[in-house]
């Protein structure tokens, strides 16, 4: 077939975690960890554009040439399903990443270390698949993350170069069915935020929680290693402020929105990066996203005023300033609304277009 190659060189802005042979250790960058996150985001985008995406935990798609679209949802057509091969290959062809810090174990409430540095991905596929993946990576560079553990602030990256980019830019289609997925990730119910501020290089050392880490030799060393790479682990500070300082609501809803590592584990719907130097080189940036679902995993509705409370707190500059010990800063939110409301499919499409 007329398969082509695309090479994407990227640099980690926060540690990248893709799992490893041994639980809790990442010995190299694993393609499967990147693929899983690309699929998760593509599912959310497809649902947000009104298309069909099966639930990956109970996949319904099996290739059947007698059915419309061969019996495959919009996502499985690209990412593969039983009897249907993925439309592209992904390989890590250069891995210059190293451990984010050298643990003694159990340091920094943000373990495990993950990897930092530059990596090059090679994507092989048809023109259309490569154009789609380029658009998806460009979107994630600005708003999302790759790999696992985004709830710890991991996986934020910057694209340095794309070689062999498709001549035809990808156009996000309106998938038009307007189906509703109240309990599955759907970009219509995502809010994105970006906080940018200027501060002297040592601003982070005055935050009490990080100051405490500096007071112990083993955590101080890990923290210094991160700082040298321009990564300040502020995610736990912000999440603690939003959850323990400003959340008022029932425990059931709190656990579902903010997550829990106890059994059964629930992944946080609110994800925020670490602080890293912005592209302009003169300021710092912290960004993230929140998914505000209509229902929890058991099909119980979540009252809109609880979702509004989370959105309002994310948009509250004073919470950011207090948590980070900063006096200035600009907070940008999408959608730019003070009262939370879901996007329309057209709104999602226009938002995606901005990144191209």
Question: What does each of the following model-derived ranges do?
Answer:
Residues 1-356:
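Basic, Gly/Ser/Thr-rich N-terminal segments that form RNA-phosphate-binding interfaces in CRISPR RAMP
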């Amino acid at each position: 077939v007329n398969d082509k190659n695309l090479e994407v060189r990227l640099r980690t802005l926060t540690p990248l975690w893709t799992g490893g042979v041994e639980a809790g250790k990442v010995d190299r960058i694993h393609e499967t960890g990147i693929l899983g996150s690309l699929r998760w985001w593509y599912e959310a985008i497809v649902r947000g554009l009104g298309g069909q995406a099966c639930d990956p935990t109970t996949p319904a798609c099996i290739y059947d040439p007698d059915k419309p679209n061969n019996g495959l949802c919009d996502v499985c057509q690209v990412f593969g399903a039983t009897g249907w091969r993925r439309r592209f290959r992904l390989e890590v062809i250069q891995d210059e990443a190293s451990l984010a810090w050298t643990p003694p174990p159990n340091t920094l409430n943000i373990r495990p270390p993950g990897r930092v540095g530059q990596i090059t991905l090679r994507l092989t596929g048809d023109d259309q698949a490569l154009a789609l993946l380029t658009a998806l990576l460009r979107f994630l560079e600005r708003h999302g993350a790759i790999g696992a553990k985004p709830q710890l602030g991991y996986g934020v990256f910057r694209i340095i170069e794309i070689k062999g980019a498709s001549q035809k830019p990808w156009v996000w289609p309106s998938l038009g069915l307007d189906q509703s997925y109240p309990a599955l990730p759907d970009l219509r119910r995502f809010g994105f935020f970006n906080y940018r501020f200027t501060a002297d290089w040592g601003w982070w050392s005055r935050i009490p929680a990080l100051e405490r880490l500096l007071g112990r030799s083993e955590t101080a060393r890990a923290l210094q290693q991160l700082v040298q790479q321009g990564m300040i682990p502020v995610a736990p500070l912000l999440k603690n402020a939003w959850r323990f300082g400003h959340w008022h609501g029932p425990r059931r809803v709190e656990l579902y929105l903010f997550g829990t590592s106890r059994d059964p584990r629930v992944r946080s719907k609110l994800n925020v990066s670490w602080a890293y130097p912005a592209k302009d080189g003169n300021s710092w940036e912290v960004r993230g996203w929140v998914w505000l679902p209509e229902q929890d995993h058991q099909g119980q509705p979540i009252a809109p005023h609880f979702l509004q409370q989370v959105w309002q707190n994310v948009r509250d500059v004073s919470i950011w300033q207090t948590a980070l010990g900063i006096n200035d800063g600009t907070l940008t939110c999408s959608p730019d609304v003070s009262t939370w409301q879901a996007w329309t499919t057209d709104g999602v499409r226009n938002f995606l277009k901005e990144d191209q």
